[in-house]
Swiss-Prot record:
Its EC number is 3.6.-.-. The active site is at D57. Coiled coil: none annotated. It is found in: Cytoplasm; Endoplasmic reticulum. It comes from the Eukaryota. Zn(2+) binds at C274, C277. InterPro entries: Anion-transp_ATPase-like_dom, ATPase_ArsA/GET3, ATPase_ArsA/GET3_euk, P-loop_NTPase. ATP binds at K26, G27, G28, V29, G30, K31, T32, T33, E238, N265. The keyword Hydrolase applies. Homodimer. It is an enzyme of class 3 (hydrolase). Keywords: ATP-binding, Cytoplasm, Endoplasmic reticulum, Hydrolase, Metal-binding, Nucleotide-binding, Transport, Zinc. This is ATPase ASNA1 homolog.
């Protein structure tokens, strides 16, 4: 990244290559307002593009931000014909991932085969976060099939997004184990599985796992390509949000996921009218100074505390002006 890049998101708004934009942050920092207003702005500035906002945050504040009820299917935002929103509960998507059934085996890229792996070895289920990561991969697969030009995720800064990036490594290890088991014990395991009521077929299991691995590797390849994917952390100038943002940035760097822009929200004006305001602003000033030092090579967008609630398309559109170049 270059030193002192412009303090706006024009490089994201006008990008002709970006397909995935993640907006994440600690609760209460304005993450959903950011993702929704950015979605409106990109749709407005690029009428030829189909834009989709997906909320994977359990709170699902996107409905509140637009003042429109959204659900698990994409719904067009009135007044913004090329922008749709959907809210997906990752926990709901996780249901059945490890159930011993064939539900979804043919429709979700082969992820239903986990039931077979669970019955065979009982290993995957014990891996922390694996069900969440695989459920998120199903959501990504679903989004790909919808043929939107750009997808914005309103998501928590940690959890399924980052866990998913390590999924191919885990699946590759599991595939190697399956191949070894197949070579050594395939016929015996199939016979034993039949006796125990487990539907295990090594000849079907291996290609299904290979397909699942290939699918997850392709998605991770997209997510680690800065021309296709970027992550925008949102914070407020306080200790915990800054600490969590720095931890997130380091983790994204380790996973080779691009992050070149940061939104700093809810900045108080300089105000000497009361001790509380003065002290609060002094605390913010300290952390704003640290943010400038830490992220001087990022597109750093600083936004003042809003005097009115940002709710509805008109308010989101007005808020989105914070992301544009100042003329």
């Amino acid at each position: 990244m270059s030193l002192n890049p412009p303090n706006n998101l024009e490089h994201i708004i006008t990008s002709q290559t970006l397909k995935w934009v993640f907006v994440g942050g600690k609760g209460g920092v304005g993450k959903t307002t950011t993702s929704c207003s950015l979605g409106v702005l990109i749709a407005d500035r690029n009428p030829q593009k189909k834009v989709l906002i997906i909320s994977t945050d359990p709170a699902h504040n996107t409905s509140d931000a637009f003042d429109i009820k959204f659900g698990a299917e994409p719904k067009v935002v009135p007044g913004v014909p090329n922008l749709s929103v959907m809210e997906i509960d990752v926990k709901d998507a996780m249901k059945g991932v490890f159930d011993e059934s064939e539900q979804g085996t043919n429709q979700n890229g082969g992820f239903g085969l986990l039931s077979e792996l669970t019955g065979m070895m009982g290993m995957l289920k014990s891996v922390p976060g694996i069900d969440e990561a695989i459920a998120f991969s199903q959501i990504i697969n679903q989004a790909q099939q919808m043929n939107y030009d750009l997808v914005l995720f309103d998501t928590a800064p940690t959890g399924h997004t980052l866990r998913f990036l390590s999924l191919p490594t885990l699946l590759r290890d599991m595939l190697e184990k399956v191949i070894k088991l197949q070579d050594s014990f395939g016929p015996m395991m199939s016979q034993f599985g039949g006796m125990m009521g487990m539907n295990i077929n090594f000849n079907e299991l291996k290609p299904k796992m290979e397909h699942m691995l290939k699918t997850s590797e392709q998605i991770v390849e997209d997510f680690t390509n800065p021309n296709l994917t970027t992550f925008i952390p949102v914070l407020i100038p306080e200790f915990l949000p800054l600490y969590e943002t720095e931890r997130l940035i380091q983790e994204l760097m380790n996973l080779n996921m691009d992050a070149n822009s940061i939104i700093v929200n809810q900045i108080l004006p300089v105000n000497d009218c009361c001790d509380y305001c003065k002290n609060k602003r002094a605390i913010q000033a300290k952390y704003l100074g640290q943010i400038d030092v830490l992220y001087g090579d990022f597109h750093l967008i600083k936004i003042n505390m809003q005097t009115n609630e940002v709710r509805g398309v008109a308010a989101l559109r007005a808020f989105s002006k914070n992301f544009e170049a100042k003329h």
